[in-house]
Amino acid sequence: MLFEDIYTKHRDLRVHIDSPVAYNMFCNYFVKTLADTYNEGPLVIMCIGTDRSTGDALGPLVGERLHKVCKYAKVFGNLEEPVHAVNLEKVLDKVQSTYKNPFIIAIDASLGRSENVGTIKIAPGALKPEIGR
């Protein structure tokens, strides 16, 4: 199967939002990655960014929607209370002190090359700020 081949060869997925298979690839890869890495701790979704910086509002916009519909995870970061470079460490400390062994999913925008505009990337592991991980 194509998806299984992609997953076993690469530990991350990059797909353009305009691809006709983007939704299916994203969902399948996300579920597979979550199944392989989830530690059974409380689920925390960290939506990183700010609408005060051009190109950095993805996290807070997603967080705004997730706050309304997400019942099984604690969501940090939205338009009213963004999580960004200035307060990220403080928010992470709060998460670590509030939840025992949290499983954190991060949603963040990345500025990069023009040919990567519209590309979604899913990868296990930590975000590495300012290096386009």
Go through each PLM region and give its residues:
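N-terminal catalytic or cofactor-binding beta/alpha core of small enzyme domains
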Residues: M1-I104, A109-R133
